[in-house]
């Protein structure tokens, strides 16, 4: 071996006295670049992991925000759906009420229409009756009531007995004279719904002070009873009036309504 063989010298240096090579130094030298590379890789991996953790945290926060936003949107949507359902329910109820109202109004309108048609028919009938009445000459003048053989008129104003007598005479009539229970019942029915007093043609005067009709005939006994006090102190005498079906005696000077009476023209009615 010569000095010019450096490899041989290196091999000699690497050999142990027993002829074996010292591998520890050589191995450490060979693994140093690998260790550095591994350290760099570990550092890069650590940085990567840190970056991933940071990104994961950001993503997690973003997901939480999105979930919160989604939850909020779901709450809003649920509220809108609930409000829409309530609105639909209210609309259905309103529609139902409106339908019932329309049906009720239609029913009332139908009833009104029927009543209107009935009134129209009655109006036509009334026109026919009035037309016939205009051409009919009855036993009593217009505005007089006919009962059996007599005509009766109820005054529209109140006067004393003497003035009421004059009014009846001007109508070619006389104050009421009741000759029968049937006639009394008729008069009672005619004034049943009135509370006013009506003069009759019955009075009590000097010198006899007995109840006499205008024609001088006396009152038929037991035909009706006269209530009230009879006084001879009345200058105009005591006169009779009928009120609510009962005959009363009173001062002739007082005012009351009256009932005029005259014979019906039965020949004209035939």
From Swiss-Prot:
Changing residue 262 to A: Impairs the binding to oxLDL. It is found in: Cell membrane; Membrane raft; Secreted. The cytoplasmic region is required for subcellular sorting on the cell surface. The C-type lectin domain mediates the recognition and binding of oxLDL. The chain crosses the membrane at residues 34-56. Homodimer; disulfide-linked. May form a hexamer composed of 3 homodimers. Interacts with HSP70. GO terms for cellular component: extracellular region; membrane raft; plasma membrane; receptor complex. Residues 85-135 form a coiled coil. It comes from the Eukaryota. Receptor that mediates the recognition, internalization and degradation of oxidatively modified low density lipoprotein (oxLDL) by vascular endothelial cells. OxLDL is a marker of atherosclerosis that induces vascular endothelial cell activation and dysfunction, resulting in pro-inflammatory responses, pro-oxidative conditions and apoptosis. Residues 1-22 are annotated as: Disordered. Residues 1-14 have a biased composition (Basic and acidic residues). GO terms for molecular function: carbohydrate binding; low-density lipoprotein particle receptor activity. The gene is OLR1. Signal peptide: none annotated. A lipid is attached at residue 42 (S-palmitoyl cysteine). Residues 1-33 are cytoplasmic. N-glycosylated. Pfam families: Lectin_C. GO terms for biological process: immune system process; inflammatory response; leukocyte cell-cell adhesion; lipoprotein metabolic process. The keyword Membrane applies. Disulfide bonds join 140-151, 168-260, 239-252. Residues 147-261 form the C-type lectin domain. It is a lipid-anchor; Single-pass type II membrane protein. Residues 57-146 are annotated as: Neck. Its main location: membrane. This is Oxidized low-density lipoprotein receptor 1. PANTHER family: OXIDIZED LOW-DENSITY LIPOPROTEIN RECEPTOR 1.
């Amino acid at each position: 071996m010569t000095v010019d063989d450096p490899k041989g010298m290196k091999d000699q240096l690497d050999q142990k006295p027993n002829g074996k090579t010292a591998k520890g130094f050589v191995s450490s030298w060979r693994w140093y670049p690998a260790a550095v590379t591994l350290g760099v890789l570990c550092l890069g991996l650590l940085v990567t992991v840190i970056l991933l953790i940071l990104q994961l945290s950001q993503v997690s926060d973003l997901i939480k925000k999105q979930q919160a936003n989604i939850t909020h949107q779901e709450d809003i949507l649920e509220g809108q759906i609930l409000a829409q359902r309530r609105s639909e329910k209210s609309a259905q109820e309103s529609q139902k009420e409106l339908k019932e109202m329309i049906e009720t109004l239609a029913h009332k309108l139908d009833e009104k229409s029927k009543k209107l048609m009935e009134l129209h028919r009655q109006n036509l009938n009334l026109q026919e009756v009035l037309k016939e009445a205009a051409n009919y000459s009855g036993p009593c003048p217009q505005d007089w009531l006919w009962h059996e053989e007599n005509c009766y008129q109820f005054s529209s104003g109140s006067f004393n007995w003497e003035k009421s007598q004059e009014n009846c005479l001007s109508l070619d009539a006389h104050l009421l004279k009741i000759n029968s229970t049937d006639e009394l019942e008729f008069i009672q029915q005619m004034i049943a719904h009135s509370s006013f007093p009506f003069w009759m043609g019955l009075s009590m005067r000097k010198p006899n002070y007995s109840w006499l009709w205008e024609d001088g005939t006396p009152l038929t006994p037991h035909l009706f009873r006269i209530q009230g006090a009879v006084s001879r102190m009345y200058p105009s005498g005591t006169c009779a009036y009928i009120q609510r079906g009962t005959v009363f005696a009173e001062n002739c000077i007082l005012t009351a309504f009256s009932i005029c009476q005259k014979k019906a023209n039965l020949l004209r009615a035939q």
